[in-house]
């Protein structure tokens, strides 16, 4: 069922290390009417980061398969080098807000997520792509165990974010 809140939103699901969990999440999102879902491979170099930025997604989710469940925000910060003392830092407020929707959904299927910490994208890789440090879209790193219903919980958390 398509929805006004999330039906046309661009959502980038990045599968890290070619895991099957990312594919299952994408399939579930499409089944729930999220038409703008795109699956990407993990960025390894500048062209991959550039491709992600060109999509201009409304939500970015890096998915890892892991024994322990963690939902982390993405940090990009450092000296840009274009002028003396120009320090850039990605605004993480929207990411923190999006992160909060995972706790309830994952606990409902018996997974207790850790919501502390951040994963860093090296500034040297993305300093020429301003979208990474100027955009406020949620960019989360989701470490998920293989559990029954995990992809549905992730889909529901994303829907809840767009509903608010």
Regions found by a protein language model. Give the residues of each.
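Loop/turn elements at helix/coil->beta-strand transitions in domains of secreted/extracellular proteins
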Residues: 9-10, 32-36, 55-60, 112, ...
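Active-site microenvironments of hydrolase-like enzyme catalytic domains
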Residues: 16, 42-100, 121-143
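Active-site histidine-acidic residue metal-binding/catalytic motifs
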Residues: 1-51, 57, 77-80
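Residue-level marker of intrinsically disordered, low-complexity segments enriched
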Residues: 9-14, 35-36, 109, 113, ...
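Active-site-adjacent mobile loop/cap segments within catalytic or ligand-binding domains
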Residues: 113-164
């Amino acid at each position: 069922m398509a929805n006004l809140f999330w039906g046309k939103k661009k959502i980038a699901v990045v599968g890290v290390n070619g895991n099957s969990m990312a594919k299952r999440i994408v399939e579930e999102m499409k089944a729930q009417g999220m038409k703008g879902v795109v699956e990407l491979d993990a960025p390894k170099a500048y062209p991959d980061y550039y491709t992600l930025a060109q999509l201009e997604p409304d939500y970015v989710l890096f998915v890892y398969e892991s024994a322990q469940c963690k939902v982390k925000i993405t940090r990009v910060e450092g000296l840009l080098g274009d002028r003396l003392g120009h320090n850039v830092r990605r605004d993480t407020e929207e990411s923190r807000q999006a992160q909060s929707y995972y706790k309830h959904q994952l606990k409902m299927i018996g997974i207790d997520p850790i919501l502390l910490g951040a994963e860093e994208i090296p500034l040297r890789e993305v300093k020429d792509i301003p979208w990474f440090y100027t955009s406020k879209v949620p960019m989360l790193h989701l470490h998920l165990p293989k559990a029954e219903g995990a992809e549905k919980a992730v889909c529901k958390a994303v829907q809840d974010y767009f509903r608010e």
